[in-house]
């Protein structure tokens, strides 16, 4: 129930702000020139961004008592007076929409008008709080397909194939069903399996089987293809972000300093060697120096922005903004990839959806139960079933993802539901449309120019037609007949290719999976930003560790892969041998001659 106990919306636009409240390699902008300067401090590592990756790094790097780590976060803590209950908007799973409605914990980004989407400006929420987007997301734990990582290896991220990534997924994870060759059993990140007995979830899974798709016991295990119960980063009725998993348990370590509400104004360089960062906190300018490395973990928007503001990026673009060039690296901000999705919505003829949970008294009851015992409808995000299928014959592994919700979502949940309804979120996983982001100005507080270039290829347009048609086919099965009312979206009048294409352009939205803007690859690749060791190419003592370094977007949600990336990078940074497991089987369809 994406609306339960939703917060007050503070306004359509956020205060302009960039990551790491980012960096610039030149004098401070007018808004901060009056800031006083204070002294010098030195650390082994400075990690910029306490999000899905940064929290992992802070924990793993401080396991060595000889490593002194400074963790800088632009947003606030995810606790209020040390309490999760008092910060229920973050920790109550069903309240996830609260933080999509304002900018308190959210960068509140927007794209440029998209030519392929009727010139619409799309909303891109990103976490600005301890835990980053793992404190705002829908808590769906999906790793992607094994072939995604083998593709990374082929694309130049050597040593990032499935055999070398799976052990780090397991290392991070503590699955409630216990360990096996795919799952971890003793990691910090609690993962639970969807287990609702809601009749609409049960009917959806049955309808998928009736449509000819298999049931998969574990879409993160042997067989991704099919429909089944989702894994969730929910533990004992509470969101289990990377802040909960990795940061909270280590805050007492004497070799970790974690700062919040901190605007990093630039990475400090001596020549091409990163030596520290400059940041602003409480109206004062500080410099933190490193004996080893600065690590950027701000995500796919903030990390490239931080690099460009620091003079690392396309030299021509930097000079236009009078930013001194440290290193010409034209791939920074390029290769932007995201998952687009549409909602196919059906009216429900029975009063069993989450529509009633929007009523004020019901909201209060749900909230009180959760505050008292962490149970009830507030203890889940309700996206507990879903699936992965191949769009057509010849596709070797799933390229369409489904999330089912026994409710209706309008405008990212920022508008209340209208009626009893259910929906499937459906989208293609490996779009061919690729975008970019660039600096809007040399002011680190300005959001960058974000241009994802959605639906710019005919292949992507055709794939979304398939998404709509295949969703309708599942919704038309007998299992959903007792609940099926009229189709709300796209609507029964939308049938032809042209009509479906128009619907998709008018209604598709981001699935909140921006990635790939600091592409990992070979140093000989002119589009690469970091090498397979996560080091920024062309400079020294600087790494990027987050979803921005993915060479290509994976076939699924991005939080689990981002945690894996940070776990693997931590071993690389510490000089540990890479974990590897070559003997884990992965399902392959018996034939590619058919779509299912």
Curated annotation (Swiss-Prot):
- Which SUPFAM superfamilies does the UniProt entry name for this protein? FAD-linked reductases, C-terminal domain (SSF54373), FAD/NAD(P)-binding domain (SSF51905)
GO biological process terms, semicolon-separated = glycine betaine biosynthetic process from choline
Name positions with the PTM N6-acetyllysine. Answer: 486, 498, 582
> Does the UniProt entry include the keyword Acetylation?
yes
Q: Which GO terms describe its molecular function?
A: choline dehydrogenase activity; flavin adenine dinucleotide binding
| Residues involved in FAD binding | 44-73
Keywords, A to Z, come to: Acetylation, FAD, Flavoprotein, Membrane, Mitochondrion, Mitochondrion inner membrane, Oxidoreductase, Transit peptide
Entry PTM: Acetylation of Lys-498 is observed in liver mitochondria from fasted mice but not from fed mice.
Knockout-associated phenotype: Decreased testicular betaine and increased choline and phosphatidylcholine concentrations. Only one of eleven males was able to reproduce, impaired fertility was due to diminished sperm motility.
Instruction: Tell me which positions the record assigns to the signal sequence.
Output: none
Q: Which domain of life is it from?
A: Eukaryota
The transit peptide segment here is: 1-34
Q: Which residues form the active site?
A: 513 (proton acceptor)
PTM sites of type N6-succinyllysine? 438, 486, 498
Kindly report, in one word, the top-level EC class recorded for this enzyme: oxidoreductase
Any Pfam family matching the protein? GMC_oxred_N
Q: Which Gene3D superfamilies match?
A: FAD/NAD(P)-binding domain, Glucose Oxidase, domain 3
The protein's name is Choline dehydrogenase, mitochondrial
């Amino acid at each position: 129930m994406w609306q339960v106990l939703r917060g007050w919306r503070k306004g359509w636009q956020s205060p302009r702000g960039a990551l790491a409240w980012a960096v610039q390699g030149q004098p401070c902008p007018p808004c901060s020139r009056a800031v006083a300067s204070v002294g010098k401090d030195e650390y082994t590592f400075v990690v910029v961004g306490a999000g899905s990756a940064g929290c992992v790094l802070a924990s793993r790097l401080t396991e060595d008592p000889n490593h002194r780590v400074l963790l800088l976060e632009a947003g606030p803590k995810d606790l209020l007076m040390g309490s999760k209950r008092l910060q229920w908007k973050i920790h109550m799973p069903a309240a996830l929409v609260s933080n999509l409605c304002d900018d308190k914990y959210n960068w509140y980004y927007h794209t440029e008008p998209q030519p392929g989407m009727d010139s619409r400006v799309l909303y891109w929420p990103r976490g600005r709080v301890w835990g980053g987007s793992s404190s705002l997301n829908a808590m769906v734990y999906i790793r992607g397909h094994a072939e995604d990582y083998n593709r990374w290896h082929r694309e130049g991220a050597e040593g990032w194939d499935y055999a070398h990534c799976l052990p780090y997924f397991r290392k991070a994870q503590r699955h409630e069903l216990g360990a096996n060759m795919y799952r971890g059993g003793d990691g910090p990140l609690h993962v639970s399996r969807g287990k609702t007995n809601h009749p609409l979830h049960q009917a959806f899974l049955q309808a998928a089987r009736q449509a000819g798709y298999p049931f998969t016991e574990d879409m993160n295990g042997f067989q991704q293809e099919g429909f089944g119960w989702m894994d969730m980063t929910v533990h004992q009725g509470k969101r289990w972000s990377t802040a909960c998993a990795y940061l909270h348990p280590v805050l007492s370590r004497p070799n970790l300093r974690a700062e919040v509400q901190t605007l990093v104004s630039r990475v400090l360089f001596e020549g091409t060697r990163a030596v520290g960062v400059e940041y602003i906190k409480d109206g004062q300018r500080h410099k933190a120096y490193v004996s080893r490395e600065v690590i950027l973990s701000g995500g796919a928007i903030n990390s490239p922005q931080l690099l460009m503001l620091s003079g690392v990026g396309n030299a021509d673009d930097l000079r236009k903004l009078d930013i001194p060039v440290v290193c010409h690296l034209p791939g920074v901000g390029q290769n932007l990839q995201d998952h687009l999705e549409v909602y196919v919505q059906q009216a429900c003829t029975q009063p069993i959806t989450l529509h009633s949970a929007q009523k004020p008294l019901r909201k209060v009851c749900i909230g009180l139960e959760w505050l008292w015992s962490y149970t009830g409808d507030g203890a889940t995000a309700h996206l507990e079933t879903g699936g992965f299928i191949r769009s057509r014959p010849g596709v070797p592994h799933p390229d369409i993802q489904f999330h089912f919700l026994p409710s209706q979502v309008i405008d990212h949940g920022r508008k209340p539901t209208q009626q009893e309804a259910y929906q499937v979120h459906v989208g293609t996983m490996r779009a061919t449309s690729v975008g970019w982001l660039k600096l809007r100005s040399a002011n680190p507080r300005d959001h960058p120019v974000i241009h994802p270039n959605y639906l710019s290829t005919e292949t992507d347009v055709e794939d979304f037609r398939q998404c709509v048609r295949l969703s309708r086919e599942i919704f038309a099965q007998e299992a959903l007949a007792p609940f099926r009312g009229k189709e709300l979206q796209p609507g029964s009048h939308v049938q032809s290719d042209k009509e479906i294409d128009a619907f998709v352009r008018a209604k598709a939205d981001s699935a909140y999976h921006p990635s790939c803007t600091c592409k990992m690859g070979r140093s000989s690749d002119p589009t690469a930003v970091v090498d397979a060791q996560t080091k920024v190419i062309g400079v020294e003592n600087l790494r990027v560790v987050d979803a921005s370094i993915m060479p290509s977007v994976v076939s699924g949600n991005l939080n689990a892969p981002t945690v894996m990336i940070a776990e693997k990078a931590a071993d690389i940074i510490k000089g540990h041998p890479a974990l590897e497991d070559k003997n884990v089987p992965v399902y392959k369809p018996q034939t590619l001659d058919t779509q299912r």
